[in-house]
Amino acid sequence: MKKMSREAFILGQRREELNMTQKQIAAEIGISLQQYQRFEYGYRDVSAASAKLVLRICAALELDPYELIFENGIDLAGKNTQE
């Protein structure tokens, strides 16, 4: 069994916080349910997706793209925020 990635965990947790189904998120993003599930189950890395798709995912889930992609986030100077 594949270990859940940090990104996948964040997606699932945030979706549940918003009380939305995977199908609702997929529809809002404009992708199929199966495509979204690949991200949330960790079979596809969000960071490997196009920037446009990452931004749509983050908008639907009300997430900061930097917090999703970069483990420690980044500040405006481009440095890790937890250094």
Please report, for each region that a protein language model flagged, where it lies by residue.
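Alpha-helical residues within the helix-turn-helix
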Residues: E16, A27, A59
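Short, basic-rich loop-to-helix N-cap that marks the start of a DNA-contacting helix
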Residues: N19, Y43-A59
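A short, Lys/Arg-rich alpha-helix, primarily the initiator
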Residues: M1-E17
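Short, charged recognition helix plus adjacent turn
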Residues: A59, E67-E83
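Short alpha-helical DNA-recognition segment
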Residues: N19-Y41
